Amino acid sequence: MQRTVVVGMGHIGHRHARAYTECEQAQLVAVCDRVEELARAAGEKFGVPYFTSAKECYAAMQPDVVSITTGGYEYSSDHYEPTMQAFEAGCNVLGEKPISNDLRHATEMVETAARLGLCYGIDMNHRFTPAARQAKKWQDDGRIGSLLFCNMALWIGKFMPLDSVYYHLKALNPHSVNIMQYFCGPIKEVSTFAMKAPGRDIYSTQSTAMRFENGAVGHLTSSYDIKRGHPMERCEVAGTDGRFVFEDMWREATLYPAETYVKEVYTNPIFDGFESFYDTFRDRIHAFVRQVDAGCKPEEIDGSGREGLEASRVIHAMIRSVEEGGAVVQVKDITE
């Protein structure tokens, strides 16, 4: 049984806390937020002690697993301090995405976890679904063959004022980039163009061409300008033996074998299937707890801190490309 704590009791923090209360291998023992009103309300809701200091919470409650769901500038600047404090206290950490808006902080967190032998995961919940696993199984079973290309699209409507001109790239695309690398491996180079939709002061829509280290090519479109009534996510992966399309996280995955006109389809079932976006959080959080509880090695963590770091590195390469007028940027050259 893993003793768990959630630090950062906003909307996402409540989802993490709820998921821990529903996990057979976890016990939620405390919540924490530096805003006392939020901490107290969450403590009362979940029936656990509350704290306003993460460091004091770790010392008092001795958790095994800590969720870091704080926000900050560009939705991630407040991840670093409570994460490092958790590692210093000997805790395994599941952090929200993006891992950090500062690649130097992200690198330090990943390296600290590795040095201390602690498990570090990032909430890449968009691919923690039965549909994504089915698509991956088709690939692992050789149904796709040698990789050719990957096309990814992710968009939601987010029209409020945001922190920075690159907020959309940094906050949304850890999901899309991680999905592409999950199926196709590390991204080698990118070329990105971005635009500010009418009335907006941020780069709210972008288009990226890329090459993977294995030679396959890809494309990513993302936007904060599409209203929420539309389907929001689509990943297409093609190879020499077949192609699959993985849609809306949990809704459907379709395999198109190269040598037949008959396709295979996984459709989320009405009974016992995913019912809402929350289910992706529950699946991802429970997967992390199960791995920690089973004694998995840090390098075996699915959706690891290193994956989060490499997704953000790609995004920072995309940003540099935008700044350089769409120039091709080598991902390995990006360190901050």
PLM regions and their residue ranges:
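C-terminal helix-rich "cap/oligomerization" subdomain common to oxidoreductases
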Residues: 11, 45, 65-70, 107, ...
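Contiguous beta-strand/loop segments that form the cofactor/metal-binding neighborhood of enzyme cores
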Residues: 171, 175-252, 280-297, 336
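N-terminal Rossmann-like dinucleotide-binding module
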Residues: 1-46, 289
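A contiguous active-site-proximal alpha/beta segment in oxidoreductase catalytic domains
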Residues: 99-160
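Hydrophobic residues in well-ordered beta-strands that form the structural core
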Residues: 52, 95, 120-122, 246
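Mid-domain beta-loop-alpha active-site segment that forms a flexible
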Residues: 123-130, 154-191, 203-204, 307
